């Protein structure tokens, strides 16, 4: 919640790197999924990322250094039927981070932001979300090392794995009608 984000910030103001990597998903038709769980998801996946990014970004801009890595998902490029709230939260993280990147560029700041957009990763996410992906997930070690390498090379959008990169490209050219059929 907001109070915990502010407490965390006040306790650890002086950091050089923020990685916003908390999140969970929920599988099911939007009209049937639990509203309280969805609001908790929005609090964690959107509000916490937003608050922590804003608080730490202000401090980083003051000292003109620092990095923020926000974790979105390849889900941020798709509508996401049956996981609509999760996909929407990840779209928010993606769009927020890319907008901040441009704002930092315009003020010629040395602060860097990146957004990580992995596809399925071998974690406990599937169990919590109640979903099984058709494609095999990447190892968390691979995603971590890839993300850090690209982040320190100042890459804005970081997409690990050939299949995930291909999926993002395909999304640019596919019709919305076709994307809505992806599950």
Residue ranges and their predicted role:
Residues 53, 89:
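Active-site helix of classical SDR
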Residues 1-7, 35:
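The beta1-alpha1 cofactor-binding region of Rossmann-like NAD(H)/NADP(H)-dependent oxidoreductases
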Residues 73:
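Residue(s) in the substrate-gating loop at a strand-loop-helix junction
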Residues 21-26:
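Conserved NAD(P)H cofactor-binding loop of Rossmann-fold oxidoreductase domains
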């Amino acid at each position: 919640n907001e109070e915990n984000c502010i407490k965390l910030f006040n306790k650890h103001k002086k950091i050089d790197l923020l990685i916003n990597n908390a999140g969970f998903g929920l599988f099911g038709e939007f009209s049937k999924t639990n509203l309280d769980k969805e609001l908790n998801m929005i609090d964690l996946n959107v509000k916490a990322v937003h608050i922590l990014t804003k608080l730490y970004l202000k401090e980083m801009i003051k000292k003109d250094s620092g990095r923020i890595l926000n974790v979105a998902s390849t889900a941020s490029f798709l509508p996401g039927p049956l996981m609509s709230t999760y996909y929407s939260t990840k779209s928010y993280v993606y769009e927020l981070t890319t907008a901040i990147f441009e704002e930092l560029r315009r003020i010629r700041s040395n602060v860097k932001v990146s957004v990580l957009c992995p596809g399925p990763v071998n974690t406990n996410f599937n169990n919590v979300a109640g979903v099984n992906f058709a494609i095999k997930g990447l190892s968390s070690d691979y995603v971590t090392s890839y993300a850090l390498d690209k982040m320190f090379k100042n890459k804005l959008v970081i997409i690990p794995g050939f299949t995930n990169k291909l999926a993002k490209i395909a999304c640019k050219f596919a019709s919305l009608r076709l994307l809505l059929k992806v599950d």
